[in-house]
Amino acid sequence: MSVTRINQQTECPSSVHDLVSCWGGCTQSKTSTDSGLEKRFELNFAQPVDIGTVTVKQLASVMERAGESLRQNSAELGIHTLKFDRSLLVFTAKQIVVRSSVSVMLHEAVHPMLELMRSHNIIVDWASFMRVNYGSPWDMTSETSDIMAHEYAELKSAFPTGHPYLAGPVDRDHCFYFVYDGIDRDPSSCRRENDVQINVYMYNVQADDEYDLDGNTKEQQLLVSHCAGEYETLRVSTYGSTHPFASFETNAVSAASDITKIVNGLLKKFYPERVLLVLLQDRDAQGTTACGVMDRLEGFTVVHRGANHFGGGYVFHQATYARSA
C-alpha cells in the first residue's frame, strides 16, 4: 500500500484538507510548543500474540522515529515495559500502548509501528490515538493546531477508515480522539469485548519527596503488573507544561471494581487543581461500576461531562472537574 509521509512534506494529502483546514492549515511546526499534557497511541490485535517474537531492539527502533531513546526495559507477568526519556510503552499479548509527553511527535511512530506488526504477521483490528489538551488548539502562543493537523493526516493515511472525535470544551480541557475499528463482530465468532480502560489526568499537582517535581528529573514512570496483560501505570512529568502533572492508567479488572477508591486516593496524594477523567468501556464489560466514579470525586465539582457511544457497542466517557472552593 502506498503511504503518504506527511512529516516529510509541507502540505497535507488532499484527502484530509477539509478537516485540517479547521485547525488553521498544515504547516510544519518550528518549535513544537503544544498546549497539551499527554499523547496516547494504542494498537489491539485480532489474535493474542507471543510478545517474545517482537524484540526490544525493534520496538526501540520504532520509537527512535519519534525522537525517543530507550532508558530501561523489563518483562513481568506477560507484560513487556519499555521506558523512554518521555514515553512509556506497554506490550501485552493483546495490545501495544504508548503514552508520551506532548513534546514527543508520537504520530511519526504510527507507520513504523504498523510496519513492524506486519513484519511479524500480527493483525491490528483496532487502534486509537488520543491527545489531552488543556487549552484551545488555536492559542497563538503554541503550535498545537499545526501539530494536530499533521497528527490527523498521518493517522488518516495509516487508517483510511478511521475517524476523529473531540470530547470536551475546545477552549479548555478536552480530548482529541482518533479511532480505527476493524473488528469482525460476526456473531459466529463468539468474540467477547470486555476491556475497561481508565485514565486520570491531574493538572498542577503537588506531591511529597517521592517524586522530584521541582528538581532536574522531568519524568517519573511507574508500572504495576496485576496479572497477565493487566496493569497500572503512572507518569509524573513537567515536560510540555508550565506546571507538573500526573497521569494514571489502568486496564485491570480488579481496579475497575474499586476505581472510586483508587481515584480518590490519587487526588488526595497529588492534590491537583483540575482533573480530567476518561473511561473507555467495551460492550461486554460486566456492570457499570467503573462509571460510578464520575459521580464521586471527593472535593471536586463537575465542569463538563459527556459520552460518545460507538457503533461497535463501546462507550467513551469523559469528564472534567475543578477543585471545590
Curated annotation (Swiss-Prot):
One of its GO terms (biological process) is positive regulation of spermidine biosynthetic process. Disruption phenotype: RNAi-mediated knockdown at the bloodstream life cycle stage causes cell growth arrest followed by death. Putrescine levels are increased and the production of spermidine, glutathione, glutathionyl-spermidine and trypanothione is severely reduced. In addition, protein expression levels of ornithine carboxylase (ODC) are increased. GO terms for molecular function: adenosylmethionine decarboxylase activity; enzyme activator activity; enzyme binding; protein heterodimerization activity. Pathway: Amine and polyamine biosynthesis; S-adenosylmethioninamine biosynthesis; S-adenosylmethioninamine from S-adenosyl-L-methionine: step 1/1. GO terms for cellular component: catalytic complex; cytosol. Keywords: Polyamine biosynthesis, Spermidine biosynthesis. InterPro entries: AdoMetDC-like, S-AdoMet_deCO2ase_core. Pfam families: SAM_decarbox. Probably has no catalytic activity due to the loss of several residues required for processing and catalysis. Forms a complex with S-adenosylmethionine decarboxylase AdoMetDC which is essential to activate AdoMetDC. Required for the biosynthesis of the polyamine spermidine. Required for growth and survival during the bloodstream life cycle stage. Forms a heterodimer with S-adenosylmethionine decarboxylase AdoMetDC; heterodimerization is required to activate AdoMetDC. Belongs to the eukaryotic AdoMetDC family. This is Inactive S-adenosylmethionine decarboxylase prozyme.
